[in-house]
From Swiss-Prot:
Enzyme class: oxidoreductase
Family: Belongs to the pyrroline-5-carboxylate reductase family.
Annotated pathway: Amino-acid biosynthesis; L-proline biosynthesis; L-proline from L-glutamate 5-semialdehyde: step 1/1
Subcellular location: Cytoplasm
Domain of life: Eukaryota
InterPro entries membership: 6-PGluconate_DH-like_C_sf, NAD(P)-bd_dom_sf, P5C_Rdtase_cat_N, P5CR-like_CS, P5CR_dimer, Pyrroline-COOH_reductase
Record field: catalytic activity: L-proline + NADP(+) = (S)-1-pyrroline-5-carboxylate + NADPH + 2 H(+); L-proline + NAD(+) = (S)-1-pyrroline-5-carboxylate + NADH + 2 H(+)
Cytoplasm as UniProt keyword: yes
Keywords attached to this entry: Amino-acid biosynthesis, Cytoplasm, NADP, Oxidoreductase, Proline biosynthesis
Protein name: Pyrroline-5-carboxylate reductase
Keyword Transferase: no
GO molecular-function terms, A-Z: pyrroline-5-carboxylate reductase activity
Originating species: Pisum sativum
Enzyme Commission (EC) number: 1.5.1.2
């Protein structure tokens, strides 16, 4: 069967699963103008989840079958342990004229393609900062997904942050870094704030300063064009306060601990997939 292109100015996007990630993507797409809410559909039995989508102008249908029938692009955003059963149940409706997308962590592209019965599938790994339009997402293309399909999904996920393309074999490592990474940073923010309190700052000021410092440093690393090591060197004067703090971090194994966290999370992702 010929792979028909999906027209970016007229396609309908359907979500199978109406959780927080689906909501973040839907809001990002509609707010950015990538896709009007009138061309987004989903289904959910929970009144609060229905209301969350209806409040931004999204049509909530009565069943997942109806969502697939109404959609040109179908995004599976259910819990990983449910993906296989959901895809298999919908398989008769998952024709090649529809582009299929999964955002479920740990579910390999080869399995998604096998369950769907065709390879017009794209796997995407976003992360939770999608909720504020700052996701780090990575996609991998199935065997029948076209460059036009990739461009469409890049545009969609670009509305909630940044997206890169990588081979599916890297997704466990991606999970360990950007998938789990926000939790490492939240822990670092909390620790910085606690350090500020220990040094005499009020709690609210310490937390605000810690959060903004991480945000600013991340922006510098992204926008300056400099290696993070160079940025670190730029702020560490000889015999100054910053190098004293960096020395303590090095003595405590700060780098190695972060590296080990990524490796451990990637290993766990492989075990679960």
């Amino acid at each position: 069967m010929e792979i028909l292109p999906i027209l970016s100015d007229s396609y309908t996007l359907g979500f199978i699963g109406a959780g927080k990630m689906a909501e973040s993507i839907a809001k990002g797409a509609s707010r950015s103008g990538v896709l009007p809410s009138s061309r987004i559909v989903t289904a959910h039995s929970n009144p609060s989840r229905r209301a969350a989508f209806e409040s931004i102008g999204i049509t909530v249908l009565s069943s997942n079958d109806d969502v697939v029938r109404a959609s040109n692009v179908v995004v599976f955003s259910v819990k990983p342990q449910l993906v296989k059963d959901v895809v298999l149940k919908l398989k008769p409706l998952l024709t090649k004229d529809k582009l299929l997308v999964s955002v479920a962590a740990g579910i390999k592209l080869k399995d998604l393609q096998e369950w769907a019965g065709h390879e017009r599938f794209i796997r995407v790994m976003p992360n939770t900062p999608a909720a504020v339009g700052q996701a780090a997402s990575v996609m991998s293309l199935g065997g029948a997904a076209t460059e036009e399909d990739a461009n469409l999904i890049s545009q969609l996920f670009g509305s909630i942050g940044k997206i890169w393309k990588a081979d599916d074999k890297f997704f466990d490592a991606i999970t360990g870094l950007s998938g789990s990474g926000p939790a490492y940073i939240y822990l670092a923010i909390e620790a910085l704030a606690d350090g500020g309190v220990a040094a005499g700052l009020p709690r609210d000021l310490a937390l605000s300063l810690a959060s903004q410092t991480v945000l600013g440093a991340a922006s510098m690393a992204t926008l300056s064009g400099k290696h993070p090591g160079q940025l670190k060197d730029d702020v560490t004067s000889p015999g100054g306060t910053t190098i004293a703090g960096v020395h303590e971090l090095e003595k405590g194994g700060f780098r190695g601990t972060l590296m080990n966290a990524v490796v451990a999370a990637a290993k766990r992702s492989r075990e679960l997939s």
